[in-house]
Amino acid sequence: MHKRDYKMDNLRFLLIFLVLLGHFMELFKGDFTSAFYKIIYSFHMPAFLFLTGYFARFHRRKLVLGLIYPYILFQIFYRIFDGLIYNSKGTFTIEFGTPYWILWYLLVTIFYYLLLPLLDTKNRNSQITIVITSIVLALLAGFDTSLGYYGSLARFFSFLPFFIAGFYTARAETNFRFPAWFIFVLGVILIVASHYIITSPEITKKVLYGSYSYEKAKYNAGIKLFLLSLGFAWIVFLLFVIPRKKVPFLSVLGQNTLAIFLLHGFIVRLAKKYQIFCYSEAENILFAVILSLSIIALLGNLWIAKWFHRLFTGSWISHLLKKRT
């Protein structure tokens, strides 16, 4: 019987919390807010895509019902929702080539899953070659000004190394144990690197999103390589410090991050519409933390997760197909 990997559940909880917190922090300003926001965006999505790769297995039904189906569904839902709350006439347009805001994650994951049969090798040298190739592609993609939000192609290349690394890490069956001195040195490096990210005028929010070319975001391949390296450094650090034991309440919520991720956007859009972050910076941050944790507790509970899975991941279609066969 497969043993539950609570370390990964705990890490997913932390990352989904940072996703929500980051989205709420976009809605207000402040020096600390700006600095913390940049630190979050330097690693939280690289780590999320690493975990996505870690748990990735190619199944046609999973691809269609677990990824393509919810992408189409929520692309429609969010377009209608935005049209209703932001357009006085209630009009909206629906198209699927350019994902709506947070749905870029689903679209690039669909593309990554399509690559899995090509990535499926147990040869260590081949794995290393593929990871290095993906890093080179991520660096070269920054020169192409045609890559952007359409098809999430810019992000596809930007986060590809993390997904592939996660996929191969799962196959290596590592225990994520590192010497204490190594983690100490890595922690110092992360502090220095984070200070550089905060103070560097070249590393803007656009750069951290992974959606813009070097020309459009005014940076270069050197900074891109630095950010890729930093993303991997954060992943190693987090895999060491996150507890491997079950943490009451948190571990369970970490198992149900898809529902939280896809549904929280509606709340964020309403928060922006009604400008609920209208206090001092410190009060806004506290409000954002409490709101993020409350949403995770609400949307990540087992009951919501069960019904979300039934309705929005195509499991009901799978159930009907099984009945007919």
Where do the protein language model's features map onto the residues?
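Alpha-helical transmembrane segments and their immediate juxtamembrane cytosolic regions
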Residues: 1-325
